[in-house]
Swiss-Prot record:
This is Small ribosomal subunit protein uS8. It comes from the Bacteria. One of the primary rRNA binding proteins, it binds directly to 16S rRNA central domain where it helps coordinate assembly of the platform of the 30S subunit. One of its GO terms (cellular component) is ribonucleoprotein complex.
Length: 131
């Protein structure tokens, strides 16, 4: 059976794994998921990630990060969904928690944070909020 929203599935797997304090979580891999994982790693929300290819199916492994026994990611919320896409221009990209969090945006120049998209001067699809 095919998945209707693979990105929402990725975010839910991360949330669920952190609630039960797992060290890592694995999921089917795709280019967009790897790009989101790279942004999460660059921003310090996860320790690391790796893509393991087993023939035709690749798997994305994400090493989760904790601080003082609590998950580093407190909020992980999907914004743009298959039924209602959310696009924002370069001047309309929202700040998450007044700049304490990050909005992950898919732009023509790749997947990046809200700060980088504003600095680059591009808008795009707001994928999710992370705090």
């Amino acid at each position: 059976m095919s998945m209707s929203d693979p990105i929402a599935d990725m975010l839910t797997r991360i949330r669920n794994a952190q609630m039960v304090e797992k060290v890592s979580v694995s999921m089917p891999s795709s280019k967009v998921k790897v790009a989101i994982a790279q942004v999460l790693k660059d921003e310090g929300y996860i320790d690391d990630f790796a893509v393991k290819a087993d023939g035709a199916k690749a798997e994305l492994n994400i090493a989760l990060k904790y601080y003082a026994g609590r998950p580093v990611i407190e909020r992980l919320e999907r914004v743009s969904k298959p039924g209602l896409r959310v696009y924002r221009g370069r001047n309309e990209i929202p700040q998450v928690m007044n700049g304490l969090g990050v909005a992950i945006v898919s732009t023509p120049k790749g997947v990046m944070t809200d700060r980088k998209a504003r600095a680059t001067g591009v808008g795009g699809e707001v994928i999710c909020y992370v705090a």
